[in-house]
Amino acid sequence: MRVLAIMFFAVAVFNCVGCSIEKPTASQQESKSSSGWSLVAEDTLNPTQQLQQKIAVAAREALFERLMKRLAAVVETEGPAAAIAVCQSEAPTIAQAVGHEKNVRIGRTSDKLRNSKNQPPEWAVSVLKDRPTQAVFLTHPDGRFAALLPVRLKAQCLTCHGPIESIPMDVRQALLQRYPEDRAIGYAEGDLRGWFWVEVPKPPAETGG
């Protein structure tokens, strides 16, 4: 039972920054941003873009698995509040490692940031103004591919992101210490928490030379 509880909390902590991927509607139309990036519907992706999409999702899954494993270890040895420190100090390093291994840029962002360093990349800024609730895909003339994957809050995530009065005192104190300007509270189950973003380069086979 203890192992199950630890794994449950670890998944809960990660799912507060994880994502559920939703398909875009068939009516989604292609549009261009000022930076050259174009929104593109999933059902119009060419074979190369479909491969890039799979790489983006695989990178997100790899980050999920690695951080979940680390959080489970911390919860077992140090308790739930210690997971807050891991999210601050180790999650960025883990994301960088996954990005290097998968040859992508990957990160997390939100319109209500907990960590002010989780700002969106330039190509995502204008798209996020509309707070997309479905997965969004973009392409660039130079062959790059990008994805924004929404984060839906699960019930167990309320331990760290719910109304302030419902957050356990030790977790609340850890949040105050680590994130004095925290804005990521007051959520309810099912709320849009934020987004994973992934940028995939042009496949090597298509690079000029």
Say what each PLM segment does.
Residues 6-16:
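Bacterial N-terminal signal peptides
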Residues 17-23:
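Bacterial signal peptide processing site
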Residues 159:
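Short, cysteine/histidine-rich loop/knuckle motifs that typically chelate Zn2+
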Residues 163:
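Cys/His-rich metal-chelating microdomains
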